[in-house]
């Protein structure tokens, strides 16, 4: 026999979620949400928290705002700056993706883009739910079922 659950719709309901753990959550959103005592969820990738891996948005930001195009050419050769460069990176194995992106991080100076493990301490609050968003934010549809499971489980274990 199923138990019935009573739900009240007297107050409007919504869930505030943040994807990927951008650092702006701490600098921009948290003060406002704290002031109004509003709960929220952050979907995190442990590799982003490690500060040694980044995704297409960061790569685009890095290319546009921070580094000399000669650095891109030195690291990746004659790839186009946006989609073509990201497509070049993502067709590689996960390990090679990480190595390529780490090399770019090493030779460039970019602002803090994602939260770090230390930043999570400032989010230690009952209103904040930290949720798994896989370990490395890879395109799951391009992975085998076993690799998908591994990404999900590793993310869960590390968080």
Report the location of each language-model feature.
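Catalytic alpha-helical scaffold of carbohydrate-active enzymes acting on polysaccharides/glycoconjugates
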Residues: 1-159
